[in-house]
């Protein structure tokens, strides 16, 4: 079963997601409860966010898996490979970080991102537009497929995602491409999920 929890920044969605999965796991008697963390630390603000999330889940029995990209690889890190998926639940926190990591990979030995190196080889705006469209499609399909694989290996999967579509601001092209990809993925996840909840000012509102 998949539950998608969405909301704006600071809405309380993370706290609600942790409370929700702890309740469900206790109620259904899941023996293993995983926290799949996708955030990478690049600055002090990022470290503060990670520290806050660690404090939130301290003492709640989570087994933490650090998986900033290639989310299907988290499956091989589930501790009891021989146990049935019926004994496992997982919280994926969060989709917006995962998508950013997939779309903007780390720099290579030359100091250039892989995507930047590919763009350097293009010789015109039409080629660039085709490349960006293909990248949005490729990353979106990859993430949705890998989340589906993960969901097949746990009894309960809770996914936290961000609502990044309502500020009405035009950003640079790379950011707009990211927002488009997030829209595709969030719609795909909502279609896959049995439950969709939006958290508004700390209040969960059932959408599906």
Predicted regions and their residues:
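Residue-level preference for the first positions of well-ordered beta-strands
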Residues: 2-4, 32, 89-91, 156-158
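Conserved P-loop
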Residues: 2-80
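Short, glycine/serine-rich, charged loops/turns that create anion-binding
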Residues: 10, 40, 96, 164-165, ...
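Residue-level signal for inorganic ion chemistry
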Residues: 17, 53, 91, 162, ...
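Short, well-ordered coil/turn elements that cap or connect secondary structure elements
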Residues: 28-30, 57-59, 85, 152-154, ...
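Short, conserved beta-strand edge motifs with alternating hydrophobic and charged residues
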Residues: 36, 64-66, 91-94, 159-160, ...
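Portal/gating segments that form or line small-molecule/metal binding sites
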Residues: 55-106, 112-119, 123-126, 130, ...
């Amino acid at each position: 079963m998949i539950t998608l929890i969405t909301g704006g920044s600071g809405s309380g969605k993370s706290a609600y997601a942790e409370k929700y999965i702890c309740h469900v796991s206790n109620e259904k008697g899941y023996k293993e409860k995983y926290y799949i963390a996708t955030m990478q630390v690049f600055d002090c603000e990022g470290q503060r966010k990670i520290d806050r999330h660690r404090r939130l889940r301290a003492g709640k029995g989570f087994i933490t898996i650090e998986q900033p990209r290639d989310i299907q690889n988290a499956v091989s890190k589930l501790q009891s490979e021989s146990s049935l998926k019926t004994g496992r639940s997982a919280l994926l926190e969060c989709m917006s970080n995962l998508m950013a990591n997939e779309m903007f990979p780390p720099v290579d030995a030359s100091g250039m991102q892989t995507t930047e190196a590919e763009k350097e080889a293009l010789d015109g705006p039409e080629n660039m537009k085709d490349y960006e469209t293909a990248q949005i499609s490729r990353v979106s399909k990859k993430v949705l497929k890998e989340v589906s694989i993960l969901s097949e290996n746990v009894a309960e999967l809770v996914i936290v995602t961000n609502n990044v579509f309502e500020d009405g601001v035009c950003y640079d092209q790379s950011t707009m491409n990211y927002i488009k990809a997030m829209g595709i993925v969030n719609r795909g996840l909502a279609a896959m999920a049995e439950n969709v909840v939006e958290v508004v000012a700390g209040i969960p509102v059932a959408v599906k």
